[in-house]
Regions:
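Short hydrophobic/charged patches on amphipathic alpha-helices used for structural packing
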Residues: 63, 117-121, 143, 178, ...
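Amphipathic helical "hinge" segments at domain boundaries
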Residues: 57-122, 127-130, 195, 207-211
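Bacterial carbohydrate/catabolite-sensing allosteric modules
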Residues: 1-10, 54, 95-100, 148-155, ...
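N-terminal helix-turn-helix DNA-binding module of bacterial transcription factors
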Residues: 1-72, 213, 347-351
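Conserved beta-strand positions in the central sheet of alpha/beta enzyme cores
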Residues: 29, 75, 132, 190-191, ...
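Active-site-adjacent beta->alpha loops and helix N-cap segments on the catalytic face
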Residues: 137-148
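Short beta->alpha connector loops
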Residues: 57, 110-113, 134-139, 160, ...
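Short acidic/polar active-site loop segments enriched in Thr and Asp
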Residues: 26, 72, 129, 187-189, ...
């Protein structure tokens, strides 16, 4: 008489601990991979993905989302993490992304386009759903990668004729500063910026000053067009160069950042140069301290937080498949304070 076969026990569905054991990682690592976290080594991520495929493991749809390249993560590669305006924008960007359920991951490239490409490539390999870049100058290979992966990209602090962007016209903003000085009567106007190689914004701002002066029949003397490093010390050094460069010194300086302008003010005081009596100074960004300098700094105000919020809105819409506007203009504005005045000669003529 044949014995009855025991009832077959249904096969147990694999769980996260099974994936962890097969992949040789912890269950926490499995969770991070399936939730799209970027902070997982590529070799461990690959091991987890292979294990989930081998076991047929699905956890609340996370593996399916991963296979569809949904990571709930946005990357940002910026030139300088010490720049106050970038930090303001990133803070607003992160707040907007957080409301949409996304995490922001950040890298700094130090004004090196090859480093920017490497950092962005790492992010793309680890998994991001969107990317923010600064400026309009980048390696073409970066956009080839994002296009192949259908990753939306937005450029900030600039405008572009072809790419999605959130920002302002750097040339127009700098021209506004130059025109204000020209209206005051200045003709010997210097321009001081940080590095312009692989930094389109510095060159565009200097070009905006030069173009505004040319339209008014003036020009920047070659010795008055300086490229320095970034920071307060660089501003101090710039004024020393301008005052010892031969020929008549400038009566006004347009600086590419407020930090450079701050350095100019410090060095002017050290040299006994009255600002704005003998020298007018204009900065760029309207940093928190600009209104509290002595004298208070005339500057170009950049609405960095608005730029960050608008960038978040653009990326969230693109990642959700919603319609978007390619260009979002957030104009910069001239803020007149106490570091600018008519040149001494113009004041004397007026008194006569």
């Amino acid at each position: 008489m044949a014995r009855p076969r025991p009832a077959r026990t249904p096969e147990r569905l694999p769980v996260a601990s099974d994936v962890a054991a097969l992949a040789g990682v912890s269950t926490a690592t499995v969770s991070r991979v399936l939730n799209g976290a970027a902070a997982v080594r590529p070799d461990k991520r690959d091991a987890v993905l292979q294990a989930t495929a081998q076991l047929g493991f699905v956890a609340n749809g996370a593996a399916r989302a991963l296979s569809l390249r949904h990571f709930q993560t946005v990357g940002a590669v910026i030139p300088n993490i010490e720049n106050e305006e970038f930090i303001r924008a990133l803070s607003a960007l992160q707040a907007g992304l957080r409301q949409g359920g996304y995490t922001l991951v950040l890298a700094s490239a130090g004004y090196d386009l090859d480093d920017e490409l490497r950092e962005a490539t790492r992010m793309l390999k680890r998994g991001i759903d969107g990317l923010l870049l600064i400026g309009d100058l980048h390696r073409p290979a970066l956009f080839q990668q994002t296009a192949r992966l259908s990753i939306p990209v937005v450029q900030a602090f600039t405008l572009s004729d072809t790419r999605p962007c959130v920002g302002f016209d750097n040339a127009d903003a700098a021209a506004r500063a130059a025109n204000y000085l020209l209206d005051l009567g200045h003709r010997r106007i210097a321009v001081v910026t940080g590095i312009r190689k692989e930094n389109d914004r510095g060159g565009v701002r200097a070009g905006g000053v030069a173009a505004a002066m040319a339209r008014r029949g003036a020009r920047i003397r070659p010795e008055h067009d300086l490229i320095v490093s970034f920071g307060i010390a660089a501003g101090c050094d710039a004024l020393r160069q301008l005052m010892t460069g031969g020929g008549p010194p400038p009566t006004a300086i347009v600086c590419g950042t407020d930090q450079l302008a701050f350095g100019v003010l410090i060095e002017a005081r050290a040299q006994g140069i009255d600002v704005p009596g003998r020298l007018s100074v204009i900065g760029f960004n309207d940093s928190d301290y600009a209104a509290y300098l002595s004298p208070p700094l005339t500057t170009i105000r950049v609405h960095a937080s608005e730029i960050g919020r608008a960038a978040a809105q653009y990326l969230l819409a693109r990642m959700a498949g919603q319609p978007t506007v390619r260009e979002t203009l957030i104009p910069a504005e001239l803020i007149v304070r106490g570091s600018t005045a008519p040149p001494l000669r113009a004041r004397r003529n007026k008194d006569d």
